[in-house]
From Swiss-Prot:
Gene: rimP
InterPro entries for the chain: Ribosome_maturation_RimP, RimP_C, RimP_C_sf, RimP_N, RimP_N_sf
Lineage top rank: taxon: Bacteria
Protein name: Ribosome maturation factor RimP
Keywords of the record: Cytoplasm, Ribosome biogenesis
Biological processes, Gene Ontology terms: ribosomal small subunit assembly; translation
Amino acid sequence: MATIENRLEEMLKSPVEALGHTLWGLEYVQAGKHSILRVYIDNEKGIFIEDCAETSRQVSAVLDVEDPISTEYTLEVSSPGVDRPLFKAEQYAAYIDETVKIQLTMPVAGSRNLKGTITGIEGQMLSLTVDGNELIIALDNIRKGNLIAKF
């Protein structure tokens, strides 16, 4: 069964791409009676506030017609930023040797919160070095993953 995020991603991918952007990912967070839909867009040239505003109008129009969310919600459109969230295998693969922070659904090595270096990805399995130990983590066990920005 498709999750709400999967259905929303399928619904919003084409309108976002029609504006010349990539749908980096999305998060649907339920908070009581009110929810938040965060849509992350990216582009090789970078994302500017005008891009977010234009995408927000387009996405809002699609959501108004399709009406996939039955509760009240707030739509937020932004770039992934420097501490970008990672959603897909190819995104993790693009950041091999980079440091990430991940939250897991089920603990691995006794923890649900890990910080480590991406050392590889094979299929839907992520290799992560944490404190010198190599861990293999199923992508579907990752609740949230973010790059840790280098300054």
